[in-house]
């Protein structure tokens, strides 16, 4: 089967070149276009440039966007298809809010993730999306869910995360801190979403099969979008070969595992009768009368969103703090100022400097590097870029964080103070700026803005505070890590660290 997979990958370029050379030579001349757009040819579009840069797409797109006066580029694809990529905040607002209904995710996008996420909230449009959004928004605004989530967070940090890190200190071990944070986040999101405890933070145990299946399914689903020839992954799926065979097996594991948990939960609820004490999302969705498949798709979507985004953001923040001792010191000062009674929910909301650090880390290393919609009808972006019906339209948080026009000449510096109205000074309460979500769209914006945004900040601030007050995180490698974008981004090779217990442990403040 692997041989057949290779044949498919070889066959498509051959067919493409046969088609190219079936046309007059003049069709191979580059089309006249903006100098900021990649070189494009009739029929094959920019596939040559795309293929040349496919292993550095982030930097390639960012370089091209810097050359563009409007911070927007057009990438021509095979047979006339186009992708418009923008780092212009006005365009982002138009796509995500002003003309929201003209920019659904679209069938090409939902096809990519449909096998894994089905019709879940993050992979649906129209009435299906709207109905799920209303239900989820209602649940996420409930005080009971907020308190339930915070209690789980506190238990996971105190009873699992801190002991794991303490053990690493005592044994002098090097640990992959990215892996620790991913396992921690998976435990938390499964408890909140499913009311089920995978207990995967024990590093002496092998990675649970469900966790590995999620990783494989997410990676291969994301790589579908990077195929130079869009149809390749569909042919591989039809033939059940190569990566698509592995994807099918991983998705089967995910779906069967989650469905088994759902059936057990339904049985528990049927026996118990009253669901008032069942606070997890699964219990809430089942109580609302939704079918098993719809509930499965919804909770898988929330698990995918909740497990990787927060762990990715925190991984990059801890690395950035290791390079900026002065910033780490200011976070510790903020923690000390909260007193010795422990951090409650309201205390976390007031940790503005820690939040600024998280925002700055996500500006430079966004958990979701890009997101795409599809134009339902012809349109014109605010910068004058014309759109055709069916165009793929991508806004690009990674590139936006690197635009001088958006963030100034110091865009490449890690400066949490840029998020304040005035430079924070000792003894004064710093006031965070109101930064447009279209300038900083890491949580999306408009009607699709992330409904778990505040919950995510709560989790990240609590974890950062709990860890930093007790430990110094020291990367063992001095090289700059490599940012890898998939469904959610991660650090290539993980973040290998030594952990040192602080001489004056400030854990009394957590």
Swiss-Prot record:
Transmembrane feature ranges: 3-23
Subcellular location, record wording: Membrane
Gene3D superfamilies reported in the protein's UniProt record: Cytochrome P450
Role according to the record: Hydroxylase involved in the oxidation of the plant hormone jasmonoyl-L-isoleucine (JA-Ile), a bioactive phytohormone of the jasmonate-mediated signaling pathway. Converts JA-Ile to 12-hydroxy-JA-Ile.
Induction: Induced by wounding.
Additional comment: Plants overexpressing CYP94B1 are jasmonate insensitive and present developmental defects in all organs.
Keyword match Nucleus: no
Catalytic EC class: oxidoreductase
A biological-process GO annotation: jasmonic acid metabolic process
Catalytic activity: a jasmonyl-L-amino acid + reduced [NADPH--hemoprotein reductase] + O2 = a 12-hydroxyjasmonyl-L-alpha-amino acid + oxidized [NADPH--hemoprotein reductase] + H2O + H(+)
GO molecular function per UniProt: heme binding; iron ion binding; jasmonoyl-isoleucine-12-hydroxylase activity; oxidoreductase activity, acting on paired donors, with incorporation or reduction of molecular oxygen
GO cellular component, as recorded: membrane
EC number: 1.14.14.48
Cofactors that this protein relies on: heme
Name of the coding gene: CYP94B1
Protein name: Cytochrome P450 94B1
Highest taxon above the source species: Eukaryota
Binding-site residues for heme, renumbered to this chain: 450
Mode of membrane association: Single-pass membrane protein
CDD domains per UniProt: CYP86A
Keywords: Heme, Iron, Jasmonic acid signaling pathway, Membrane, Metal-binding, Monooxygenase, Oxidoreductase, Transmembrane, Transmembrane helix
Family: Belongs to the cytochrome P450 family.
Cysteine pairs bridged by disulfides in the record: none
């Amino acid at each position: 089967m692997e041989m057949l997979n290779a044949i498919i990958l070889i066959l498509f370029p051959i067919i493409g070149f046969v088609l190219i050379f079936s046309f007059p030579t003049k069709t191979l001349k580059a089309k006249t276009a903006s100098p900021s757009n990649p070189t494009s040819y009739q029929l094959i579009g920019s596939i040559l440039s795309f293929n040349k840069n496919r292993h550095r797409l982030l930097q390639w797109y960012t370089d091209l966007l810097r050359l563009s006066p409007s911070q927007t580029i057009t990438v021509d694809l095979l047979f006339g298809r186009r992708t418009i990529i923008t780092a212009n905040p006005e365009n982002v607002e138009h796509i995500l809010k002003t003309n929201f209904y003209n920019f659904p995710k679209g069938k090409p996008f939902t096809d990519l993730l449909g096998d894994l996420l089905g019709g879940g909230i993050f992979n649906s449009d129209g009435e299906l999306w709207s109905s799920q959004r209303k239900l989820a928004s209602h649940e996420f605004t409930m005080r009971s869910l907020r308190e339930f989530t915070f209690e789980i967070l506190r238990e996971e940090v105190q009873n699992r995360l801190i002991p794991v890190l303490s053990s690493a200190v005592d044994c002098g071990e090097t640990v992959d801190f990215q892996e620790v944070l991913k396992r921690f986040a998976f435990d938390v999101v499964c408890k909140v979403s499913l009311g089920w405890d995978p207990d995967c933070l024990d590093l002496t145990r092998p990675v649970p099969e469900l966790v590995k299946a999620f990783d494989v399914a997410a990676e291969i689903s994301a790589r579908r979008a990077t195929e130079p020839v869009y149809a390749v992954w569909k042919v591989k799926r039809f033939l059940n070969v190569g990566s698509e065979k592995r994807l099918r097996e991983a998705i089967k594991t995910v779906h069967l595992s989650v469905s088994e948990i759902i059936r057990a939960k339904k049985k528990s609820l049927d026996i118990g009768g009253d669901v008032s004490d069942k606070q997890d999302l699964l219990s809430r969705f089942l109580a609302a009368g939704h079918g098993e498949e719809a509930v499965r798709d919804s909770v898988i979507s929330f698990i995918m969103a909740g497990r990787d985004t927060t762990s990715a953001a925190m991984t990059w923040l801890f690395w950035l703090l290791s390079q900026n001792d002065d910033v780490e010191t200011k976070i510790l000062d903020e923690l000390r100022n909260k007193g010795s009674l422990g951090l409650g929910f309201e205390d976390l909301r007031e940790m503005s400097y820690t939040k600024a650090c998280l925002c700055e880390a996500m500006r430079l290393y966004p958990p979701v590097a890009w997101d795409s919609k599809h134009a339902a009808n012809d349109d014109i972006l605010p910068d004058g870029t014309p759109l055709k019906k069916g165009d793929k339209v991508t806004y690009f948080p990674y590139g936006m964080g690197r635009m001088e026009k958006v963030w100034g000449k110091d865009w490449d510096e890690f400066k949490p103070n840029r998020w304040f109205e005035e430079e924070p000074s000792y003894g004064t309460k710093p006031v965070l700026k109101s930064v447009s979500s279209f300038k900083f769209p890491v949580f999306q914006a408009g009607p699709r803005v992330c409904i778990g945004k505040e919950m995510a900040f709560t989790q990240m601030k609590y974890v950062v505070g709990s860890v930093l007050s007790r430990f110094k995180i020291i990367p063992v490698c001095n090289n700059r890590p490599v940012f890898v974008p998939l469904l959610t981004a991660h650090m290539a090779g993980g973040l290998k660290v030594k952990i040192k217990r602080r001489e004056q442990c400030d854990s009394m403040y957590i």
